[in-house]
């Protein structure tokens, strides 16, 4: 599978499914384009080979804030529910590639819905469940949503009722469906939709995966589109640093509402053939209990939680901690010194920086992939150029290229061509001191920014 081959090119990591020889990628040029692969094909491949492997785990406190049971889904069960839901979506007779909004909190339903929309041949549009009616309306209009999948209850909030108000103001929204209980009148009950739907293999050709839409900075006026292959590539690049093995667990505190949450959570778990456990609503006691559950675990958390985690007695089975930053960001000074007082162990920490919705860059502290080193000298980036490459302009701003950062803006719902080999400019530049990056800052573009100063060249091997 292309994602695993991309990982093996850079580091010999475990794969999502068995049967791919370790030597398969040796001698493969670094700039070979990655073959097309989708999140759904990764789910199906693992479901066929390891049907009893755990795919998604709901948080134990889920009934308290949703009135829905906490379920542990095997890969086989998840694949069946995804196909049932996808068949139901196809029965709506929407044109292929229609935009379907997902306004869900990040529990198992969110993961299954993302996969089902892809399997139905439509575009999943990630709508943060925290958005109010006005922002949801703006997103629906800007993306030209045809349908939305949501949830009846989230704590004291009622997302389905909020979206009913949006549907009354935006007539292009043809279908509104929600997971229950207590689904409002006029809203399709997704639980019934799934249970009453047909099971088994899909009839006829499976529609092509159509990608997804997210929003830059959580702004409904700034939708961007990326293909499913680009999401898989972003997850593959992240896993080079995080090194998640099949059957291990990713415990994520970041919802799949944007690139940073999706690529480090659901997509990473599917690429690695691992388990994903999420915590849509953070609770300290529930988090402590989840962290101490048996089994090798990789934690994905917002970077601001580093101080809290540093003071904890962390379980021995915690293999790594991915601290996810949003640019602009500052690297904590103590993160550069291994074994500092009250600090996390450097070799288990991965810094991940989200450059808007353009790209993710991940590196393990205390190694040659430490982001303070890589962003200090871009030629230290060792990922395959087909996956991601990096340059800095004369004004210091970073630009990305490669399948992991192939993204394009939507203009009133019209999707432009996704640039294959074009550089994706960002407004962010590293702050350098003695050859190290100490922060990422936002800078105004200068007139001479077009000429690159430093390239991260393609790596031909290890």
Regions found by a protein language model. Name each.
Residues 101-103, 110, 114, 118-154, ...:
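Short beta-strand->loop structural element characteristic of the AMP-binding/adenylate-forming
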Residues 31-35, 55-93, 98, 107, ...:
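Conserved AMP-binding/adenylate-forming core of the ANL superfamily
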Residues 123, 142-151, 210-214, 221-309:
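AMP-binding/adenylate-forming
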Residues 2, 122-193, 291-322, 459-462:
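Structural core segment of the AMP-binding/adenylate-forming
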Residues 180-182, 188-196, 298, 310-389, ...:
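Gly/Ser/Thr-rich phosphate-binding loop
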Residues 68-71, 84-134, 251-259:
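Conserved AMP-binding/adenylate-forming
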